[in-house]
Structures are given as C-alpha cells and as structure tokens.
C-alpha cells in the first residue's frame, strides 16, 4: 500500500501501516496438505483448485490462530523457514494470510470471491513490491524488539545436523512507481511515496555479549 500521501496544500492525512502475520510455523506444500479428495472436486481450473484448497485450510487454521486477547500476535510474522536448501515457493501461511486479508476486506460470498480476484479484473496495486527469500548470511545483522542490533546466525543446530535460516522479505520495487510516487495519486495535488515497512519475526541471533538465543527481529514485510 501507499505508506504516505501528503497533499501539496494545507491538508494532511494519515498513512496506513502494514499488516503483520501471526507467528505460526509450518512445513509442506499444497500436495501434502490438501488431501486425496481434491482431484475429484470437479473444479474447472487450477486457479479455482488453489483457491478451494486455501479456503479449506483457512477454516482449519482457525483452531490454531493466536487468541485475539494477545495483542503482541499482530507483531509477529510467518516468514521464516529452516531448511537445508533455498525454498522454492513462498511460505504457505503467508499465502493463506494474504488471501484471508483479501477476503475479509472484500466481505463477499464464496461464489463472488472466486470471480472478483483483483488479478482477474486487471487491477494494479498502489505500490509495486518484490518478495524473495533472504539468507542470514545476506542479512548479517538486524534490530530486535528492544532496539538493539543483533547478529543473525546463518545456521540452526538440529539433532541430525544444521539447517539454514531463510527469511521471506517483501520490499518496494526499484522499478516502476517506487520513485515516482504511489500509483493512482494525482501528482498535481498530492506528494506520495512508496515505502518499505517492517514487522517482527522470530530468529536465532547473537547479541553483543555473545549470548545466543531466539529473538524477535525486524525484517522487510510490505511496501
């Protein structure tokens, strides 16, 4: 979203913050989670199949969602994965949350939802963004919840060896409207800027006193 849009005249509005994601962990893919009956559902396209699976998983996910009374849950993200190799696709819970946020915002019936996907209507986002997996070796350091700079450890020890930490980061794209302002904002009357915002994820880190532990650190999560 457009993080800041200020008019050129004596008018001001508040920019909207970014959404963060609950701190849940998962492994696997749609093939391992969707079950054996998906092939017989009679859906006419791969897109409909994908949406159908996501809707089922969202229903099941309600059981393990953090309590609404836990305000800190809004700070945490599901963008971290421990793996022996670079993940080939975005985190499943990230896709679930993105799709759920769209459904909640649209507030539509199931049938209308499938036929009103913004991608199908040719809609464009206000700000262009890019998402990719980043290793701890590329991040090196990060800021924790107390504001201290900590070292992000590249490998996490497990019973059978070590796994690497990967972070799924989203930031504003250097191409397109990132430099020119937010898409859809009238430049004659408003100044706007696309900005990368951050949220917290849990990662294995080391502080300046060489103490190793799991801490919440900030990573890029939206534009």
Curated annotation (Swiss-Prot):
GO biological process: cell surface receptor protein tyrosine kinase signaling pathway; modulation of chemical synaptic transmission; negative regulation of neuron apoptotic process; nerve development; nerve growth factor signaling pathway; neuron projection morphogenesis
Protein localization: Secreted
Propeptide residue interval(s): 6-114
Matching SUPFAM superfamilies: Cystine-knot cytokines
GO cellular component, one term: dendrite
Glycosylation-annotated residues: 107
Keywords, sorted A to Z: Cleavage on pair of basic residues, Disulfide bond, Glycoprotein, Growth factor, Secreted, Signal
Keyword Protein biosynthesis: no
Signal peptide: 1-5
One Pfam family of this chain: NGF
A GO molecular-function descriptor: growth factor activity
Gene3D superfamilies: Cystine-knot cytokines (2.10.90.10)
S-S bridge residues: 127-194, 172-223
Listed InterPro entries: Brain-der_neurotrophic_factor (IPR020430), Cystine-knot_cytokine (IPR029034), Nerve_growth_factor-like (IPR020408), Nerve_growth_factor-rel (IPR002072), Nerve_growth_factor_CS (IPR019846)
Family of the protein in this entry: Belongs to the NGF-beta family.
PANTHER family in the record: BRAIN-DERIVED NEUROTROPHIC FACTOR (PTHR11589:SF3), NERVE GROWTH FACTOR NGF -RELATED (PTHR11589)
Functional description taken from the UniProt entry: Promotes the survival of neuronal populations that are all located either in the central nervous system or directly connected to it.
Protein known as: Neurotrophic factor BDNF precursor form
Species assigned in the record: Lichanura trivirgata (Rosy boa)
Name of the gene: BDNF
